[in-house]
Amino acid sequence: MKKIIGALSLVLLIGCSLSGNRKNDACNHSEWYGYVNICLPTIDGMKECRLHPRVQAFTQKYRESGPLLGYYLNDKTYQRIDSLGTFSFDNYFMLYGDYNRENYEATATDLPLMQQQLEQSLVGTNWQERGRQVEDVYNTLMIGQPAIIEKYSPCSDVLTMIVLMKYRQENGQESTVISAANCILVKKRLLNMAYYMAYDGGKTIDLLKERNDGAVQKLMQLNQ
């Protein structure tokens, strides 16, 4: 696609802590965010390609409000990277910041406010609070009106929203996207990490959360 955060899991929390202590992953790739160097994780089946000229051109509008620290395409899409922007795609990650807070020393108390601001910017409806089922939400979803399906914390210092959104493609066809919008506190800095997939029923949400949570954990482990 061209244009285009439940309950705390003790198992994941322990996993973040223990894995971070093992230091299994080297910081082979990193990007500066203000005065802080952020290590970029490797994600299975994906290529990090933020510096590719086509990615730079494709993400120009995102970079007007903040730096793009990481951009991950799956292997299949990466094979067509030279024509990025001429076809629709999904299954990609974005790690980005905000110029207004890149040198702000944040604490854990800033995370809920950050998530609240993100939720307000979506101008969506929190269906989790209303007790609606996902398929019920999907059947009543309107273009340009995102629905927040779930909120949870996959790891310490991370708040995640699962967002369902319908939009109209340039050819007039309607598409539905499910995304994980992560608010992250790492090295006293606030970052966003988003993962997008085409929605294909409830199973898509489980897969999205599995992949998203794994990538977020790797990011936190590398930046302990």
Regions found by a protein language model. Name each.
Residues T42-D44, H52-R54, V163-Y167, Y195-M197:
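A mature extracytoplasmic/lumenal domain signature
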Residues K2-L10:
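Sec-dependent signal peptide recognition
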Residues K188-Q224:
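Surface-exposed amphipathic alpha-helical segments
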Residues Q60-N171, T176:
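Conserved polar/disulfide-associated segments of primarily extracytoplasmic proteins
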Residues S175-V186:
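Short, surface-exposed beta-strand/loop micro-motifs that present aromatic residues
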Residues I14-G15:
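C-terminal motif of bacterial Sec signal peptides marking the signal peptidase cleavage site
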Residues E170, A181, D213-V216:
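Core RNA-modification/binding signature centered on pseudouridine synthases
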Residues R22-L68:
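Start-of-domain marker
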